[in-house]
Regions:
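Sec/Tat signal peptide C-region and signal peptidase I cleavage site
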Residues: 15-19
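Hydrophobic alpha-helical bundle signature of multipass membrane enzymes
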Residues: 20-194, 216-222, 226, 232-408, ...
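Short, glycine-anchored, charge-dense loop/turn motifs used at functional sites
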Residues: 336, 490-497, 518
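Residue-level detector of functionally pivotal "anchor" positions at catalytic/ligand-binding pockets or at interdomain
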Residues: 452-473, 480-481, 532-535
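Non-cytosolic beta-sheet module surface loops
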Residues: 478-481, 512
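Short beta-strand/loop motifs in extracellular/secreted proteins, especially
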Residues: 483-488, 516
Length: 535
């Protein structure tokens, strides 16, 4: 019963129709979002080998402050929806504002409000000291409130969470300009290192938190409705969409892989040696198990997270959905591998791996990016859209899957991070594909049915009224006299299925509707959730 109530609270509270300015309302509350303090590891301590990359990047950022790039970073420190809109207006070539493009502005504004909650709990948990405070200097962002920052945790970066969330959302809305948008979003996070407000690992963590935020948003009927409206508004400016828009090109978005001449190579080497120390532990055994990357392997891993069985017999729709996503992620990872060759750690350092039988075959394949990590993180994000009751466990497993490749000696840490970013924007590009939408809808409904979430009244019902399900009918009964109002029934994608003016006891039929999730509201409040399991 606890999982049922949590599922309802987390998955379906997105239908909020209260009379207020929706531009300022997040799509989900913080307790309905993944918690980065659970699925991500703690930030590196200053005594950790992993701090080497943070320190090197701090030095690099400091060297950039007196350059035009440093001026850009300082200007970007303003923390507002208007500044974010201005940044992406410049990138996309038209004005995004509340007056000029109200639908796109709403999407950005509400996305930002939600993204802020993606990192808040982790910030409070770790309260990491920021670079400028640790190094006894002043922050270089013109709009940064230094005193506020001193009392606000550095890990993960809030600015980066907002910037990368916005980039992912706008790239989904406008795939015609996805490379430019995503590159701009990547630079926005880099700016926080330059001004000394964040360590590199804060920024890396925030990009992952942002990707979980956008994955979570896909389950919100309000988000999908706002996305559709923003897309329509965008096409009025852009014109007819091209027939075929491919996937984002990572070569245009992320920097080239780190080579041995780069100062950042020392961070990769440090991470390699630290991970290598885990090989003779249970974590090393897990890394060997994680070498397998078939769909069936991921279904088994996610089954453990969910405490239920997922396979092609029990969950054919979920299997079909993950199989489709798996193929797309793998193809995009291969496309990047074929264009960027990097030697694997065990080849570069000559120190062997955890899986020696694969070394000869894999030695001529690029280390960058990690396909295993692309699949592990991408499929975990894909599952978030289905399983709001188990988000953190699935995301933690997806993250660990990538780290297993560092432990095994098959990938550098930076290969894994690049793979996770590739996975996120590839997955959200798929949201525009009709086949993907068909598969994810079927998978979402199948998961709800497997969990047994069927016809659950919501506790926050209007006073003096009782709600129940009788067969294919939603029945509203007033217990303290007649009430009037509007009873709406929505599909999970936000479409109004039934609209009834209520005066007294009412019964609304769901007969004839396909298998799916339906949400009833009375005068704007969610009153009933029905997972229809019969036709």
């Amino acid at each position: 019963m606890k999982k049922v109530l949590f599922f309802l609270a987390v998955c379906l509270m997105g239908v909020r129709l209260a009379a207020q300015d929706l531009d300022t309302v997040p799509y989900y509350d913080d307790n309905q979002m993944p918690d980065a303090g659970i699925y991500l590891p703690a930030p590196p301590d200053t005594s950790s080998m992993l701090f080497i990359d943070d320190f090197q990047q701090w030095l690099w950022g400091k060297s950039m402050r007196s350059t035009p790039r440093g001026q850009q970073a300082s200007w970007e420190s303003e923390y507002s929806v208007e500044r974010m809109c201005q940044i992406y207006s410049d990138a996309m070539g038209f004005v995004i504002s509340k007056d000029a493009t109200p639908a796109i502005y709403r999407l950005v504004s509400r996305g930002q409000k939600t993204a802020a909650q993606a990192v808040d709990r982790a910030k409070a948990r770790y309260m990491r000291i920021r670079p400028f405070a640790r190094m006894n200097e002043h922050v270089a962002g013109a709009f940064d409130d230094e005193e506020h920052l001193r009392g606000n945790g550095s890990y993960p970066s809030g600015h980066t969470s907002l910037g990368w969330t916005t980039a992912l959302i706008l790239a989904q809305m406008a795939p015609e300009q996805q490379d430019t948008i995503l590159r701009r979003g990547w630079e926005y996070g880099e700016s926080r290192v330059i001004v000394g407000a964040h360590w590199q690992s804060d920024v890396d963590a925030a990009r992952l938190a942002a990707s979980t935020c956008v994955a979570r948003l896909q389950a919100s009927p309000e988000f999908r409705s706002d996305m559709a409206a923003a897309r329509t508004e965008y096409l009025l400016w852009h014109g007819a969409a091209p027939a075929n828009v491919g996937f984002p090109n990572t070569r245009h978005i992320l920097p080239a892989p780190i080579d041995t001449a780069s100062y950042r190579y020392y961070g990769d080497v440090a991470a390699h040696w630290l991970a290598k120390s885990l090989r003779n532990t249970p974590r090393g055994i897990q890394a060997v198990t994680d070498h397998s990357k078939y769909v069936e392997d991921f279904l088994s891993q996610f089954s453990d997270c969910l405490d239920m069985t997922l396979d092609s017999t029990v969950a054919p729709n979920i299997t079909a959905y993950l199989t489709y996503v798996h193929a797309k992620l793998r193809a995009e990872s291969r496309r990047l591998k074929n264009s960027r060759f990097r030697r694997r750690p065990y080849v570069q350092l000559g120190d062997g791996s955890l899986i020696p039988e694969e070394e000869e075959e894999e030695s001529t394949d690029s280390s960058y990016p990690s396909t295993h990590s692309t699949l592990g993180w991408g499929l975990a994000l894909a599952m978030v859209e289905l399983t709001p009751d188990s988000m953190n466990a699935i995301l933690q497993r997806g993250f660990e899957y990538g780290y297993s490749r560092v432990i095994a000696g098959y990938h550098w840490a930076s290969d894994v991070q690049a793979a996770r970013l590739l996975a996120s924007y590839t997955l959200f590009r798929l949201q525009r594909e009709p086949e993907f939408q068909t598969l994810v809808a079927a998978a979402r409904n199948e998961y709800a049915a497997l969990r047994g979430y069927a016809g659950i009244p919501v506790a926050d019902a209007a006073s003096g009224a009782a709600f129940a399900r009788a067969g294919d009918n939603i029945v509203l009964t007033f217990t303290d006299g007649q009430q009037t109002g509007v009873l709406n029934v929505y599909s999970i994608d936000g479409r109004v299925i039934r609209n009834v003016n209520v005066s007294g006891n009412t019964s609304v039929s769901l007969a004839g509707l396909p298998h799916g999730t339906y949400i009833a509201t009375f005068n704007g409040r969610i009153i009933f959730v029905s997972f229809k399991t019969t036709f």
